[in-house]
From Swiss-Prot:
It comes from Bacillus subtilis (strain 168). Keywords: Cell membrane, Membrane, Transmembrane, Transmembrane helix, Transport. It comes from the Bacteria. Induction: Induced by sulfate, part of the yoaDCB operon. One of its GO terms (cellular component) is plasma membrane. This is Putative transporter YoaB. PANTHER family: INTEGRAL MEMBRANE EFFLUX PROTEIN-RELATED (PTHR23513), MAJOR FACILITATOR SUPERFAMILY ASSOCIATED DOMAIN-CONTAINING PROTEIN (PTHR23513:SF6). The keyword Glycosyltransferase does not apply. The lineage of its organism: Bacteria, Bacillati, Bacillota, Bacilli, Bacillales. Residues 1-11, 69-75, 129-136, 189-219, 277-286, 338-343, 399-414 are cytoplasmic.
Length: 414
């Protein structure tokens, strides 16, 4: 049954493990910033914590492939688990409870090294163990598991756990969920990953190529920039948007439910825009649905509670559409490897790095500009960047799409 819908049966427990791990990792995303601000930190200080976390994500995303080649999938995933547990426990005990900013910087950085090593190593495992004819679907299911856990279940769980356990214990419970996820992915999952034998020089050469391609192929660099812009709202909004919503009658708990609904829309439309991209064209999909669509609805999401009097229905509908339009960037995962020619592996490294950097850039923009132009100004900056990504996409020349579509796996966009 699972094989028929594209999930490799031998790795089914691993997919469940990714859902649970990412649920634990993402459960504080929608409420940590407003909690820290309510307890004495400034918006800029809160944003700086998330920016440093984003740097850790970028580093771990970049090196996840190299670690897998050196240590194997399960060991690399276990390393990710250790980074997460140690970083989270230290963050709570020495940073969170005492609001010690320097300690929070260090410990949240360590935590940020965790999930890329865990999740992206499993993704590589899936790629190695799935027949080519079913690879695109299997990769799609991985991203569904990833988004369901991090953005949907994590937010929904927090909206109830905070009421039942309080903020501190909810954060502690994240360790339970990531350990449960690791148990399914590493122990209940009995599949064995046999990594390809490669010389150390070959691994180093591939890593270096992931840097040099940015200079030798400007189209790959442009695609990486577009991928960063794709997720600036995903990681930037949680820094300040919950406080804006609260000013208009939408509490943090209700906001968490809205945030989960937003990314439920993202998951649904990730599937839809994969099909739309094939029919409407990769570039057209990114330009009109991703760039222009996100630019418009980013602004609407900010002003929705203002003009609707805090209407939950209005904000939820606009948020659902915004989350869906983020998926308009799905074809960038096909465009970048295509324009890279033979260097598809290096192109995927660039996309992984860009996905990690977006977790830095979004909060960093809030940190830099919220004191100058306020939350409203930051939203307009986000909108302008989304529109700029449409222009950048227009400038990328790609070969005839029909000749390469069947060779390319999707990159989910959030």
């Amino acid at each position: 049954m699972l094989d028929k819908i594209g999930i490799p049966k031998r790795l089914a427990w691993g997919f469940l493990g990714v859902v649970l791990f990412m649920m634990g990792d993402g459960l504080e995303q929608g409420w940590l910033s407003p909690f820290l601000i309510e307890n004495g930190l400034t918006v800029q200080q809160s944003a700086s914590i998330f920016s440093i976390y984003g740097i850790a994500l970028a580093i771990a995303s970049w090196f996840s492939g190299v670690c897998l080649e050196a240590f194997g999938a399960k060991r690399t995933m276990f390393m990710g688990l250790l980074f997460y547990v140690i970083g989270t426990a230290a963050f709570i005990v020495f940073g969170f409870e005492q609001l010690n900013l320097p300690v929070m910087y260090v410990t949240y950085f360590v935590k940020g090294l965790g999930y890329p090593l865990f999740a992206y190593s499993f993704l590589t495992w899936v790629i190695y163990r799935t027949p080519q004819s079913k690879l695109s679907t299997a990769v799609g299911w991985f991203w569904i598991a990833y988004c369901l856990g991090m953005f949907v279940f994590g937010a929904w769980y927090s909206s109830y756990a905070i009421k039942a356990f309080g903020y501190l214990n909810t954060l502690w419970s994240s360790i339970f969920w990531v350990c449960l996820g690791a148990f399914f992915a590493l122990f209940i999952n009995k599949d064995r990953f046999e990594k390809k034998k490669r010389k150390r020089s070959e691994t180093a050469e591939e890593l270096l190529k992931g840097v040099t391609i940015l200079f030798t192929n400007p189209r790959v660099l442009t695609g990486g920039i577009i991928r960063i812009i794709n997720s600036i709202g995903t990681y930037g909004f949680p820094v300040f948007l919950p406080m804006h919503m609260a000013q208009h009658g939408i509490s943090t708990n209700v906001w968490l439910q809205i945030w989960g609904t937003i990314f439920l829309g993202n998951i649904v439309f990730n599937l839809i825009f994969g099909i739309v991209g094939d029919k409407f064209g990769w570039k057209n999909t990114v330009i009109w649905f991703g760039g222009v669509g996100c630019g418009i609805f980013t602004v609407l999401l900010y002003y929705a509670p203002v003009f609707s009097g805090g209407s939950l229905a209005v904000v939820s509908v606009i948020g659902f559409i915004w989350g869906g339009l983020l998926a308009g960037y799905v074809p960038i995962g096909a465009i970048v490897p295509t324009v890279a020619g033979k260097d598809k592996g290096a192109a995927m490294s660039v996309l992984n790095l860009a996905a990690g950097l977006s977790a830095f850039v979004g909060p960093a923009l809030a940190w830099l500009f919220i004191g100058l132009v306020g939350a409203q100004g930051v939203v307009w900056i986000f909108a302008a960047l989304y529109l700029a990504s449409a222009v950048l996409t227009k400038c990328i020349h790609i070969p005839e799409e029909k000749a390469v579509k069947e060779e390319t796996s999707p990159q989910y966009a959030s």
